[in-house]
Amino acid sequence: MLYAKALSIGDEIGFFSPSSPATAFAPNRFQRAKAYLKAQGFELVEGSLTGKSDYYRSGSIRERAEELNQLIRDPNVRCIMPTIGGNNSNSLLPYIDYEALRNDPKIIIGYSDVTALLLGIYAQTGLITFYGPALVASFGEYPPLVDETFHSFIDLLCSETNQYQYTMPSSWTDIKHDWETQHSAKPVYPNEWQFIGKGKVTGRIIGGNLNTMAGIWGSRYMPEIKVGDILLIEDSLKGIENVERSFAHLAACGVFERVSAIILGKHELFDNKGTGRTPLDVLIEVLADKNVPIFYGFDSCHTHPMLVTPLGVRGTIDFDNHTFKLEDRWVKAK
């Protein structure tokens, strides 16, 4: 197992665009996100494709891979964060300099389409990666939601402890605003976490964005889901028919027969097609008679605020006391 060093205020965070060109299509939100992290004391290092666009992506496959590799090889960069996800991060996997990352482990964080990179890097190097915020998508949000996301970022990445208990944010949102015309905080909903099961479950946390995992499934970049694992899954902007298909894919692959519990994150702007059903309802139907406990509504997903979750470390869900905590270290001493 490989661990990056914990972050310190003043460290350099490198950002890159592995898929969608957010720095080009959302310049106002991009500038706001940069200003926010700089105001918290971090230095930012721009990736080579900043401000560039090749229609649906920031650059060619090789250009995007080289942008990431430049940050991996920069000894001053201690954390690497995407600007946003998209659909094509998996294209980079054959070209990443894994050896450089083994020699100088860095914090690799992101979510959504970047799941392909998080899991691929973990599978190839053993480096603990982090399901967490992206620069433009997350830190371009307005307070108080962005502050809660940042507090989780600091709690997890600047800490050298080997235990952490998550606290449920009091509110959340998936309300969609035009990024370039948004000028204030979004309305929020009261929060709720649901614990469906009994007793305690401890296992390795693995997973990420459900749709993205399908793009690396069966490859050397997808870590084996082992007996006893805690599966983290979430998705965004999908219809109920696609969610059922994704869950059924996991079932067909025998995943639900191996995992000890499922963490199902909130689904941003879920389209239930008039059924009134939730992703939880769909999951329970697909599970059928499999008695897999579910922690539903965890805020490590596309909604705001976002909680940081290390992948590859041991966690414990207490279904009786409604708690979720980490039981392993996820970074090493500075």
Swiss-Prot record:
The active site is at S112, E234, H302. This is Putative carboxypeptidase VC_A0337. GO terms for cellular component: cytosol. PANTHER family: CARBOXYPEPTIDASE VC_A0337-RELATED (PTHR30237:SF5), MURAMOYLTETRAPEPTIDE CARBOXYPEPTIDASE (PTHR30237). The lineage of its organism: Bacteria, Pseudomonadati, Pseudomonadota, Gammaproteobacteria, Vibrionales. One of its GO terms (biological process) is proteolysis. InterPro entries: Carboxypeptidase_A_C_sf, Class_I_gatase-like, LdcA_N, Peptidase_S66_N, Peptidase_S66C, S66_fam. One of its GO terms (molecular function) is serine-type peptidase activity. It comes from Vibrio cholerae serotype O1 (strain ATCC 39315 / El Tor Inaba N16961).
